[in-house]
Regions:
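Conserved N-terminal beta-strand and adjoining loop/helix that marks the start
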Residues: 6-33, 50-53
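Conserved Nudix-box catalytic region and its N-terminal flanking loop in Nudix hydrolases
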Residues: 32-69, 158-162
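A short coil-to-beta-strand element that immediately follows conserved catalytic motifs
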Residues: 75-83
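NUDIX/MutT-family hydrolases
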Residues: 111-142, 162
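Charged phosphate-binding loop/patch that engages nucleotide di/tri-phosphates or the phosphate backbone
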Residues: 142-162
């Protein structure tokens, strides 16, 4: 516990509940990226990149390799962390962090899962798609730009890129 003195004593905790997830932009080397059409999620419908939760005790990079295998049938190699997305969930105030990866080496046979159908789509056309999950287009620059490594949403509803 740290105390910060600013117009009186305020107590702040260094710990908070955090939900850790991952997402990966997999490139095929021909200008296409692997897209997932989430259709079975109760509130998140549309296109995004595959990914999921980091399980308790699991390291972050192995979690994205596992999630990609589970959701696409492909085994990715050497995924590179390209940034993060974070926000506080309004329901419970819990911090939600998404570790964003890019990979271009993979093996296996592409197959869809219960999470949704997966398919290759031209990266150059993705930003303009009307099928994207709400807010996904705001994350794309973190995957594609060397100058942006984080996107977060303030509790006032602002989107900030770093």
């Amino acid at each position: 516990m740290i105390r910060i003195f600013y117009q009186g004593a305020i107590q702040m905790s260094r710990t908070e509940e955090v939900e850790l997830t991952n997402m990966c932009m997999l490139c095929d080397g021909k200008g296409n990226v692997l897209v997932q059409n989430k259709k079975n999620h109760p509130t998140w419908h549309g296109w995004n990149f595959p990914g999921g939760h980091v399980e308790k005790g699991e390291y972050v990079t192995p979690s994205v390799i596992r999630e990609m295998k589970e959701e696409t049938g492909l085994t990715i190699e050497n995924p590179k962390l390209c940034g993060i997305k974070e926000f506080h969930k309004t329901e419970d105030g819990k911090r939600y962090i998404v570790f964003l990866y890019v990979a271009n080496r993979f093996s296996g046979e592409l197959k869809s899962s219960a999470e949704g159908d997966v398919f290759w789509y031209p990266l150059s056309e993705l930003q303009q798609s009307t099928e994207l999950i709400d807010g996904f287009e705001e994350m794309l620059p973190v995957f594609t730009s060397d100058g942006i490594s984080e996107v977060y949403y303030t509790q006032d509803g602002d989107t900030v890129f770093c």
